[in-house]
Amino acid sequence: MAHCAVVATEKGAGGDREHDILNGERSTQRETDAVTQRMEIEQRVWEVLDGLGVPYEVIAIDAAYADTAAFCERYGFPLDHSANTIIVSSKKEPRQYCACLGLATTRLDVNHTVRKLMGVSRASFASAEDTMALTGMMIGGVTVFALPRDLPIYIDEMIMSLDYVILGGGSRSLKIKLSPEVLQRLPNTNIVGSLSI
């Protein structure tokens, strides 16, 4: 449901009402656009997974608990079977990007392993805005599925020894549970040792 943004003004009642209605319409349109975008990216993720012909489980969640630690605590999943997809960017122009998948219990080694894999002098996590522009996904929902085909994907080898892994589903409202073996079937994917520390 849309909520009007009420702004205190010194106008008469009519002016205030008109201002509130306009704000409400803008808010409704923004929310509609956000829902449409979320549904489109979720559909793309499902199409990729279905195209791989592999079994997977979709976990619908409250978007407020999309961040991995909050998700695990809220829904009772183990943190050591959860992974985060993080977009990394070079700091210098022209910008280069890659996607890294690491366990939630570890930390990406951006300054050494990832930087060397990218062949750049300095690298850092991409901003939320750059991540959205590149992938169409919000932080907390980013997944290795449905990424641009030319984007390098680096997966921590520790993930491959798990019986299952849970990762983002494309939006903050979904998680995907599947066998790590599936990850090797994605294009432009490399399994990397010491990706995380």
Task: Go through the PLM ranges and name each one.
Residues C4, E18-I197:
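Extended, low-hydrophobicity, polar/charged segments
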Residues G12-A13:
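Short, strongly patterned local motifs
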